[in-house]
Amino acid sequence: MIFIFYGCQKNQTWIDTLPKPWTLSEAEFSSIIKKFNKRYPDFNDRLKQFSKWQVGKPYKIFCLGEETLPDVDPIFRMDVSDCTVHILTSLASIQSQNWNQAKSNLIKIHYKTGVNGENIPSYKKRWHFTTDRLLFNPSTKNITDSLLDEQDIQRISLILNQKQNGDEFLDLDWTKKVSVGYIPNNMINNELLNELPSIAGIAFVKKSYFKMGLAIAHEGMIIDNQSIIHASQEYEKTVLMNFLDYYFTDEGPRFDGVMFFTFHPLRG
């Protein structure tokens, strides 16, 4: 146990010596990402340590785009983040040796594959809905149903991107009917967290969103079965904190339940 603790401290000490990622040029980022790959050969460990390096990054909602209309934001960036951008840019970066490769990997993760197997940045091909991504994107695989007995899972059916009045939530010419299982608040505890791997994704369910064709209001990463790293609009930056303390406030739970997912390398 002492050795493990020392190893964790050593990792954090090295990360603390690095310049903050949002202050770096593309060349400086490329140099440091090579060191992450060499220092942390294990995929999940590298993702965890890279995510810790992001703590403190300024928050900006909806900050990735296609660099062309209708969304001219950058395809890949390190200067700001929101909850989903933290997940996607971290996943892309840890599978890369430089800035350009991270951008290329981000495209593979953030956009649906076309009929010819290509990933082309396009607003309508983006994985806009976290629920859709967890159920069908191989980089972020839903594990919610494996964590509890069937009777402890809440289930809903909804049509993604279809509002209660039948209109689309986003102008995508796309809807999808899905069945979603999530863990209700009365089942969220330390025992549940101990069932997770050392790093796992968490997505927060908001029932009031169902009528808009949405299920997920926020997402982040659970590390070491107890802490959450997430880009927070409330804190205006990426933060690391105790998950249960964050989720259960004096006024009650922040959300109506959660989904969990695991992270996976790109194929091919």
Tell me what each language-model feature is.
Residues 191-195, 211:
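Short, surface-exposed secondary-structure edge patches
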Residues 32-35, 50, 54, 105, ...:
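Residues that form generic nucleotide/phosphate-binding pockets
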Residues 13-85:
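Cationic-aromatic interfacial patches
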Residues 57-183, 195-198, 203-206, 216, ...:
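Acidic/His-rich structured neighborhood in mature extracellular/periplasmic domains
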Residues 204-268:
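C-terminal soluble interaction/assembly domains
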Residues 188:
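Contiguous, non-catalytic segments that form substrate-binding/exosite surfaces or channel walls
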Residues 1-16:
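Bacterial Sec-dependent N-terminal signal peptides
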